[in-house]
Regions:
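A Rossmann-like FAD-binding core segment of flavoenzymes
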Residues: 67-166
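Short, conserved acidic/polar surface loops in the N-terminal third of protein domains
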Residues: 3-12, 54-58, 90-91
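Conserved short-loop catalytic and cofactor-binding motifs
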Residues: 18, 46-53, 81, 85
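FAD-site-proximal beta/loop scaffold in flavoenzymes
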Residues: 2-6, 10-37, 134-170
Length: 170
């Protein structure tokens, strides 16, 4: 994870805005935050821009959180602030969300106010081109790069990833 990829975000910020990308203390923290959130609260989910590991991951997480909220905190909502204009398996997720959760989930593409320019963990808000967005729980997933072994071995490009030929997978 690239903790320096967003203004205002750092390893220290994960205590208030967990990325929860790796299982363990971060996922436990996100769970506690959801349990402690008031009924009627807002969860902001902020996926990273492409590329990143497990492209469906943030949207699978959205589905799990939506199920929890529908069951335990039905007045709450989720806003996905997504820098991307589309995401992996989007039509499947959107139709499932519409069927099971209705207006509980709102997805905002980058050009519709989803692109975040900075985060403010102290005040639990993020800034988009349309202004500040406050969340009771903010799951901010920072930009990513290839693993340490690949980086230390000099296999990565300037963007931090290992180039792959999409035809041959070499």
């Amino acid at each position: 994870l690239r903790f320096d990829s967003m203004e205002g975000y750092s390893k220290n910020a994960t205590d208030k805005m967990p990325h929860s990308w790796k299982a363990g203390p971060q996922t436990a923290l996100l769970r506690r935050q959801l349990e402690n959130m008031r009924n009627g609260g807002t969860v902001l989910i902020c996926p990273p821009g492409n590329p990143f590991r497990c492209p469906p991951g943030p949207y699978e997480r959205t589905s799990l959180i939506a199920h929890y909220l529908k069951t335990h905190k039905p007045k709450s909502k989720i806003i996905i602030l997504d820098a991307k204009e589309k995401f992996s398996k989007q039509s499947l997720f959107m139709s499932g969300w519409d069927l099971h959760y209705g207006d509980l989930i709102e997805w905002r593409a980058g050009t519709a106010g989803g692109k975040i320019s900075r985060v403010d963990p102290q005040n639990m808000q993020v800034e988009t081109e349309f202004g500040m967005e406050k969340g009771d729980v903010i799951n901010f997933i920072p930009a990513q790069h290839a693993g340490k072994v690949a980086r230390d071995s000099g296999l990565t490009n300037k963007k931090g990833w290992c180039p792959v030929n999409q035809v041959t997978f070499e």
